[in-house]
Amino acid sequence: MVTFSHVSSLSHWFLLLLLLNLFLPVIFAMPESYSFNCPDGEYQSNDVCCKTCPSGTFVKAPCKIPHTQGQCEKCHPGTFTGKDNGLHDCELCSTCDKDQNMVADCSATSDRKCECQIGLYYYDPKFPESCRPCTKCPQGIPVLQECNSTANTVCSSSVSNPRNWLFLLMLIVFCI
C-alpha cells in the first residue's frame, strides 16, 4: 500500500530528475573554459588551437593536431584576405562607385582601392565612397589648396581683387 509519505518522496525524486533532465544538456553544452585563448598566430577550432593561414588564403580544413596548420586554400578570384587568418572564406572584393576610379585592383592579399574622380573629393573619411563635387572659390578669392580626391578646395579668406578693396573702402566711408 502506498502512503502519503511515499508519494511525497516520489514526487521529490521525480522533480529532481526533471530538473536534472533540463539542466544537464545545458551544462554539457558549455565550453570547458570561457577564457580559452590561443596564442598569437593561432585561432580556435572546436577545442584545438590551429596555426593561422597566411594572407591570400583561407582555412579549407582546420588542424587535427594542436598548434599545427590545417589545410589552407588560395582565395578565389574576386576575394581576398589581407592578413593571416582563421577564416573559412575569403572576403569579397569591394567595387568602385560610378564617381570613383580604381587605383589598385583586388588581389588575393588586398582589397580593391578606389578614389574620387577628378573634380570630386571624399566628403566623409569614415565613408570613402561618399564623393562630392569640389568647391570653387568665388571670383577674386585666391585658391590656397586645389581640390584633390581626398580634400576639398581651400579658398583664401582674404580679398585680393582691387575692386573688392575699393568696395570695402566705399562701405567704410558710407558707414562713417
Swiss-Prot record:
Membrane topology term: Lipid-anchor; GPI-anchor
Glycosylation sites: 148
GO biological process per UniProt: negative regulation of extrinsic apoptotic signaling pathway via death domain receptors
Record keyword GTP-binding present: no
Keyword DNA damage: no
Tissue localization of expression: Ubiquitous.
Cellular localisation: Cell membrane
The TNFR-Cys repeat ranges on this chain: 37-72, 74-114, 115-155
Pfam families referenced in this protein's UniProt entry, alphabetically: TNFR_c6
Keywords noted in UniProt: Cell membrane, Disulfide bond, Glycoprotein, GPI-anchor, Lipoprotein, Membrane, Receptor, Repeat, Signal
InterPro entries, per the entry: TNFR/NGFR_Cys_rich_reg, TNFRSF10, TNFRSF26_N
Signal peptide positions on this chain: 1-29
Disulfide bonds: 38-49, 50-63, 53-72, 75-90, 93-106, 96-114, 116-131, 134-147, 137-155
Function: Receptor for the cytotoxic ligand TRAIL. Lacks a cytoplasmic death domain and hence is not capable of inducing apoptosis. May protect cells against TRAIL mediated apoptosis through ligand competition. Cannot induce the NF-kappa-B pathway.
The protein's name in its UniProt record: Tumor necrosis factor receptor superfamily member 23
